[in-house]
């Protein structure tokens, strides 16, 4: 099973520009989590912080119990071997064919024979649907194939944690769905902890077990998918429905005057874009028939059962419906905790009120209640920022700079064309 990743009080700035502050969450081991947010909210910066490519000013990052912000360079080098990373642009070496791209981490970081390397590479190419394309250069294949090649390379060291940065970037909706299915199947096959950074709504609704959202330098919330997908938080509803009505604007944030003006236009009959509000929970993608049963499903159901009484009422209802409709052959029996679920309400001794986002603080909605999962509704700031671009093309998908031979900072090589 993949390892647990936990961050506590994480704050990152570029100079005087604060990217996000006091971010705390836990990625449950072996589950698929997604981090959402408008463009420029620091989602990719968060990924790079998890593997030590960027160093936050404050906080802790625990990878399998080790704080990578306090460990030695040698320890960090070893911890990075737990990771597989799919960067937004694939980060393939343009001068290498797909076979050599996928083989690169094995040749760079192991002493395996070429026969063993070939066996592993072909296995990962088959898993990602690239058999027959191994001799092609990155410039000769489609964007979707480049994504899958980057994913194959991220898998060759048998990672326990897979970080995926914008898997839908540059892809049409259909290819994005295929990539999403591949990620679910990989989780079923190797039981790795997966974190996907995205602002793709369909992916957000259908893929992850857990969802978080960054906005205005804060983690708005993080928890079981049902919490965010049933949330009445304005920024969450706006984001999930892709509409102009809400606090997100072209410059990341809006003032009250702009929000009032846009609402007046809608009231006058102007279409605000986006889709009609989606009611209820869209079913989560399942592993392809023939792949192993996703063990994460059972672990997650057991975990959310333990915390369900602390969740908003709408999330409780959605979770209970999910438990009631679970295939009996899958994993989990009906809920049997201290509370009881009756006629659309969750009743527990001493807890009769209906939960909503405004009541989170009254439910112990913080680290003490969730074991550092930090399901918090942090206050929003007022000023926006633009996220400085980061060049990933010099890194291989194990989280190393391509070409370095020690735990220090070596030169990047073989940048993709």
Regions found by a protein language model. Give the residues of each.
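A short, proline-enriched helix->beta-strand linker immediately N-terminal to the Walker B motif
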Residues: 156-160
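Helix-to-loop junction immediately C-terminal to a conserved catalytic motif
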Residues: 51
